[in-house]
C-alpha cells in the first residue's frame, strides 16, 4: 500500500507538465508543495533547492523534466530532448539512428497539450498522428493534429493520468515518481537538502548541480541521485524492488555510499540488484552470439562525478520500471513503497 498523502501528491504532480527545457512552471508547483511542507526553497538556473533544518545532513537529487515535444515552426514539432541538447547535424552532434528508431512510432496516437512555459497556462490539445526523420536535419519531426496555432518555442506535453493496474502504477513516471518521493520526504520530517534539476533528459542537469556545489558546497559532498531504471518486461523488473549501481558509463560511484544502501536494503529485507553488473552479464551472452553489446548507461550521478574532480561523489537509487519514456511506464506498488521506506531510513541514518 502507498501512503495516501504520497498518492495524492503523485496525482497532482503528474497532471502538471514539465517538458525538457520548459520546467519553469513545474518548479512553481514544486515550490508551493515544498513550502507547504516546511522546506526553505531557493531557485537557481536549472535547479530548485529545498532545504530542511539541517541541510548538510543528507542530500538527494532527482531530475524534474519529462519527455515531450517542442514547437519549432509553423505546424512543426520536434522531440524536446533533442532540441534542448542541440543534437542535430547543424552542430555535428547528430542523434543516432538507433535512438531515433526508438522514438519514431513510440508516441503515435498519443494525446498531447501545449502550455505556456513560464506560467504553465494551457494552450490547447492535440494528438500525435505520425513521426518521421527529417533528412535535412537528421532529427525526428512529429505531426500533431489540433495544435496548428502553436508558435515556435511552445512546449507540448503528453496528456497523462495516474493509473492503478494489477499491483502496479502507470503514468509517465520518469521522473515524476522520485520527484514525488522527495517532496514526500519533507512530509515525513526530512531535514536535509533536495535538488530538483532541469534538462536531465538532454544531458545538462549535472552542470546545474555542479555549479551549485562549486558555489555553496563543502570540500567534499556526498549525493544520492534518485531515478527510474528501465526493464524490457514486467517479469524482469519484478525480480528486484530496488536498482543500485557501482558505476555507469561515465564514472565509478562512491563505494561506501553504495555499500550503505546495500546494507539498508539487506536489513529491511528489500531485494535489489546492480544494473551495471546485470548489463555486463547480458553483454557476455550477446558477444558470444556475435551481437553488439549494450551500454551500461549514463546517469546524472556519473556525469557529475566525472566532471567535478572529487568535489561531488555519491551513488544512485533507482526504481525498476517498464514502458520506459511513455505514459504507460509502470512500477510495482511494492517497489515504490520499498523505495520510499529506503530513502527515509537513509535520511535518518545520515542525521
Sequence positions of predicted segments:
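N-terminal hydrophobic/helix-forming segments and targeting peptides
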Residues: 1-351
